[in-house]
């Protein structure tokens, strides 16, 4: 259960950063991991997080070490029952308290691997010149190829996707899925 509170949260790097705002307000850790449910395992097992989620709508908790869609639905129903409000009211209150995040994902399917790798390589070569410059009217705070240092076993996962993080915390993420390309 959650009677002792939430120890921390985690999201995969491409996932909306909305949970970051909540974690900051609750003064709990928020971990940004590579894509792949396996990266939540060490955090869950070490009790560093209570809740986690990823960009493909997988949601879980420390009650089980796997994605649990039924749990997510039941959790939402429990929140609505406790708050005695509509989903719309709950979301409006959330946005007032934590701000509103917008998320848009674009998947490009069936691109030959050599073309996808060439595009990714070209974008990677531009990263160095982006940090500190203006992009879409905002200063680029971070321009990198995301690497993750697991806080439990100190393993490093490199080349997990390109990130541009702007001064208003909006982000542009580009990554190769490894599953949706052909060739």
Residue ranges and their predicted role:
Residues 3-180:
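Phosphate-binding and adjacent anionic-ligand microenvironments
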């Amino acid at each position: 259960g959650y009677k002792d509170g939430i120890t921390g949260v985690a999201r995969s790097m491409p996932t909306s950063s909305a949970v970051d705002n909540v974690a900051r307000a609750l003064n709990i850790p928020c971990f940004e991991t590579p894509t792949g449910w396996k990266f939540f395992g060490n955090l869950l097992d070490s009790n560093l997080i209570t809740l986690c989620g990823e960009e493909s709508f997988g949601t879980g908790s420390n009650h089980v070490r796997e994605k649990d869609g039924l749990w997510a639905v039941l959790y939402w129903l429990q929140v609505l029952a406790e708050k005695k409000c509509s989903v719309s009211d709950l979301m409006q209150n959330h946005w007032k308290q934590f701000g509103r995040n917008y998320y848009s994902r674009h998947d490009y399917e069936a691109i030959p691997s050599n073309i996808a790798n060439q595009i990714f390589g070209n974008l990677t070569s531009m990263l160095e010149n982006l940090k500190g410059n203006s992009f879409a009217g905002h200063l680029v705070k971070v321009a990198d190829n995301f690497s993750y240092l697991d806080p439990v076993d100190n393993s490093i996962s490199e080349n997990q996707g390109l990130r541009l993080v702007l001064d208003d915390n909006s982000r542009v993420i580009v990554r190769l899925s490894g599953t949706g390309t052909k060739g």
